[in-house]
């Protein structure tokens, strides 16, 4: 059996690993996405902005990657909203490239 857990903030990562998670997933919604689309067009299935269910800064993602390197439990980033409009794909690509550049390479993608 594989335990997969949703991460709401980077502070939860170590607790999830210690509790036995084999894999973690999270949403990353940078400011540039929120500024342009807000939650009218969410980036993933966790559409709320004002609760602790999204990571919102690249600096936090860099810290999370360092934790992944230490604890060896992978993190998958979600881009799995029900649909995207054509103009969003360029920004999604940029966001994914930013994440790849800091070491993330597993994504859940839907359109």
Residue ranges and their predicted role:
Residues 1-110:
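Non-catalytic helical/linker scaffolds that mediate oligomerization, partner binding
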């Amino acid at each position: 059996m594989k335990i997969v857990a949703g991460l709401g903030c980077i502070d939860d990562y170590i607790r999830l690993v210690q509790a036995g998670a084999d894999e973690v997933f999270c949403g990353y919604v940078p400011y540039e996405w929120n500024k342009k689309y807000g939650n009218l067009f969410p980036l993933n299935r966790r559409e709320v902005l004002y609760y602790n269910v999204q990571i919102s800064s690249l600096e936090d993602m860099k810290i999370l990657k360092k934790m992944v390197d230490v604890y060896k439990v992978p993190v998958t980033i979600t881009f799995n909203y029900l649909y995207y409009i054509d103009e969003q794909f360029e920004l999604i690509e940029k966001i994914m490239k930013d994440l790849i550049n800091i070491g993330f390479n597993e994504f859940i993608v839907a359109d």
